[in-house]
Amino acid sequence: MELENIVANTVLLKAREGGGGKRKGKSKKWKEILKFPHISQCEDLRRTIDRDYCSLCDKQPIGRLLFRQFCETRPGLECYIQFLDSVAEYEVTPDEKLGEKGKEIMTKYLTPKSPVFIAQVGQDLVSQTEEKLLQKPCKELFSACAQSVHEYLRGEPFHEYLDSMFFDRFLQWKWLERQPVTKNTFRQYRVLGKGGFGEVCACQVRATGKMYACKRLEKKRIKKRKGESMALNEKQILEKVNSQFVVNLAYAYETKDALCLVLTIMNGGDLKFHIYNMGNPGFEEERALFYAAEILCGLEDLHRENTVYRDLKPENILLDDYGHIRISDLGLAVKIPEGDLIRGRVGTVGYMAPEVLNNQRYGLSPDYWGLGCLIYEMIEGQSPFRGRKEKVKREEVDRRVLETEEVYSHKFSEEAKSICKMLLTKDAKQRLGCQEEGAAEVKRHPFFRNMNFKRLEAGMLDPPFVPDPRAVYCKDVLDIEQFSTVKGVNLDHTDDDFYSKFSTGSVSIPWQNEMIETECFKELNVFGPNGTLPPDLNRNHPPEPPKKGLLQRLFKRQHQNNSKSSPSSKTSFNHHINSNHVSSNSTGSS
């Protein structure tokens, strides 16, 4: 029993480390798997792709890199990219150095005598920016100037890009991105835990070596529990939210028995484990503050999509290899219709907000209550309305949430106590974060006085704790309870519409990030000498014929060897080849 767990963990750790070889977990055939199609095969994509500058040149990571490469080959455009890079650097500069960095940008790019002067930024805007810089520099100082540059780039430069080999290469990447995804796209490793409809296991993309967590939703279990809308809702929300503080959906596919969500793998365990199983319960305030800030950023990204999470609790906050956190398990999240409120008594006992317990209509307010519960628990080492391991009925916990005030020990600083009280205000209308400004209001609380959120969002701040890379922060394989077999449920063609909505393959932004992070983009994104067209982008160069299979090569060789034979034997042999060829094709298509 113990041996099985050791073997499973050893295999997983080796996969996480890249297998110990130069390929870093990639298949021997990874270049074959990611071989570009000839550009002639991308014409349908060219006709149908949405030609939106923001999407193609900014939001999509590979699109952004290729547009930059295009600009760097055009005299006069390179300085615009350099200016945008400088503005991005300015926004993550420490507050005390903003003035100095701002002056550098003004002098280099917004002064007429400069060799890289950005003429497209109007003089009135330059004067306003300079005045604000002299008064008090802020993070958003150059936002309007950057917007002005983007407005210029989305014009003639963007249209030139669409006719360039760089956009053709982007179409090749999109063609690869849209290839079918199946269970054979991945290697499967040990079970990490259980979800509502099935197991969660570690997996690895064969082509890139990137590790993910695969959440299996058993088809029969979904159908028995009538969970189709819940499963599809989670998938669609994950697909739309692109946040470094929320687990990302990279792939969605189906097998004969299950629907599979391939998600960011978080190897560092959950906050519940770290609060209660690593020394004395709770964290030092500095560590609690860091996690609270990242959770707040994740909520802000969800709320930007008008999505309320509704299930904030320590076990749903996961740590990655480096100690950063992400919000996971969006099964109870729901998108709120524009200008509307929703109702629903869902969540976890002890963490549900008063308005949820009272079955009142609400918007995003339950998430700020949940944040208050989390900050309290991280510092105190127990939840605000229930003692650690306290045996108490659900009704009593609900009563405490509605009627009693939480108790604060010596562990809380005045700022920590203040933010918890303001987030745990029972009247949602008076709660911190529930006004028009939302997360921005919470960020201004004195508890976060020393937190530079721009640098945090850019991944430039070191976490207070880094998980052990040689540890597997989950239960032993045999301690994870297995699901029972679902009986009395049959799958039929009426389920196919739901499966087709779910199994949509790769998700653009995570897939493109995977190509960049695993250096597949760097290795494959090669053009001809001195910027010339490579054969796969040359319309006058016919595409390479597909490689022949082993059987075809053997038959060809045998045919050549027998070409000197008598006509009768040759006819007989050809008949034999044709028979085998038909048989082989039949087998291959099954």
Swiss-Prot record:
Q: How is its activity regulated?
A: Inhibited by calmodulin with an IC(50) of 50 nM. Calmodulin inhibits GRK5 association with receptor and phospholipid.
Q: Where is this motif: Nuclear localization signal?
A: 388-395
From the Swiss-Prot or TrEMBL record, give the protein name: G protein-coupled receptor kinase 5
Q: What class of enzyme is it?
A: transferase
The UniProt entry's sequence similarity note says: Belongs to the protein kinase superfamily. AGC Ser/Thr protein kinase family. GPRK subfamily.
Which of this chain's residues are annotated to bind ATP?
A: 192-200, 215
Family matches, as PANTHER family: G PROTEIN-COUPLED RECEPTOR KINASE 5, G PROTEIN-COUPLED RECEPTOR KINASE/RIBOSOMAL PROTEIN S6 KINASE
> What biological-process terms (Gene Ontology) are attached?
adenylate cyclase-modulating G protein-coupled receptor signaling pathway; apoptotic process; fat cell differentiation; G protein-coupled receptor signaling pathway; negative regulation of apoptotic process; positive regulation of cell population proliferation; protein autophosphorylation; regulation of cell cycle
Outcome (variant: residue 163 to E): In a lung neuroendocrine carcinoma sample; somatic mutation
State how changing residue 391 to A affects the protein, per the record.
Nuclear exclusion
How this chain sits in the membrane, per its record, is: Peripheral membrane protein
- In this chain, where does the modification Phosphothreonine occur? 485
Q: Where is this region: Interaction with calmodulin?
A: 20-39
Q: Which residues form the AGC-kinase C-terminal domain?
A: 449-514
Q: List residues of the RGS domain.
A: 53-171
**Gene of this entry:** GRK5
